[in-house]
Amino acid sequence: MRTEKIDKSIHNASLATPKQAFSQVLSETLKTGIIKSNLLAMAAGLSLALYVTGIPIGEKLPEILFAIFGSAFVIGAAGAFNNIYDRDIDAIMDRTKNRPTVTGRMQPANALVLGISLSLLGLLLLGVASPRAALFGFLGLFLYVVPYTMWSKRRTIYNTEIGSVGGAVPPLIGWAAISGDLVHPAIIGLFVVTVLWQMPHFYAIAIRRYDEYKAAKVPMLPVVKGFKRTFIQTNVYLVVLAASSFFFVSLSWFITIVALVLSLIWLTLSIAGYKRMEPKKWATLMFVFSLNYLTILFTVIIGFSLLSPLF
């Protein structure tokens, strides 16, 4: 039954789809935008580890390069597997209906070979950087593909929470490529922040694409419980996110203050915006700031970690 629905949805979505260059097909199959954002998260964890251990960047250059390329391949593989499994609901949603696995420009069998190949190569490269990095790479890949994509995404309103654990693994990969101390407050804080950030971010996407998720029967929180419940739950996560900023106290008060201020601005925008805007405009505001939050915080962490030893 699922196969029949997939075939019908893909056929309907591919009728008027223009041809694409192979590089574009590959990019969309592997989700290069997600690869880039996750590499930034990985770099934040790696930079923190260099700072905490006091190891000069030059001494770990091979490990750094293996971690970068290994992470990119594993994250790309996760994107390929997700595209294969979700092609039926992707065909229904406007933002995903032109993905190569939907239009037929990338056949599922080819995407599967690509995903498996990149998984093996990526994990091998991470293993050269550090066995712990490879372990986290495998864990992140598994959590994203199986508990999230194949199970919770279509079954529960807590799919975002379940998926957030796998989505927060890249900083752990970067850290583990350099340091074996997995209980340091800095990396715990970075992991917690990355987990918590995802709920307000993806709730905002779910509101902006409410009709599409509803049509695809994906039980996102706003679709099942409504906007008010989503607003309340968003603010709860933002309060906890602000509190989690204090994980960085032992590392740097500067990073702590940056993380705290960003969280409080986000919370203020949420409360003030909800009172003045209709839900989709509020969600757009939340979505845009979520991107700024993570980009600014990770950039500050990377800059602080790499530049502080020079002074």
Curated annotation (Swiss-Prot):
Disulfide bonds: none annotated. It is a multi-pass membrane protein. The keyword Kinase does not apply. The chain crosses the membrane at residues 39-59, 61-81, 111-131, 133-153, 162-182, 187-207, 246-266, 287-307. It is found in: Cell membrane. It holds the Pfam family UbiA. Gene3D superfamilies: UbiA prenyltransferase (1.10.357.140). InterPro entries: Protohaem_IX_farnesylTrfase, UbiA_prenyltransferase, UbiA_prenylTrfase_CS, UbiA_sf. GO terms for cellular component: plasma membrane. Its EC number is 2.5.1.141. Its main location: membrane. Coiled coil: none annotated. Pathway: Porphyrin-containing compound metabolism; heme O biosynthesis; heme O from protoheme: step 1/1. GO terms for biological process: heme O biosynthetic process. One of its GO terms (molecular function) is protoheme IX farnesyltransferase activity. It comes from the Bacteria. It catalyses: heme b + (2E,6E)-farnesyl diphosphate + H2O = Fe(II)-heme o + diphosphate. Keywords: Cell membrane, Heme biosynthesis, Membrane, Transferase, Transmembrane, Transmembrane helix. Belongs to the UbiA prenyltransferase family. Protoheme IX farnesyltransferase subfamily. Converts heme B (protoheme IX) to heme O by substitution of the vinyl group on carbon 2 of heme B porphyrin ring with a hydroxyethyl farnesyl side group. HAMAP family: CyoE_CtaB. Carbon 2 of the heme B porphyrin ring is defined according to the Fischer nomenclature. Interacts with CtaA. This is Protoheme IX farnesyltransferase. The lineage of its organism: Bacteria, Bacillati, Bacillota, Bacilli, Bacillales.
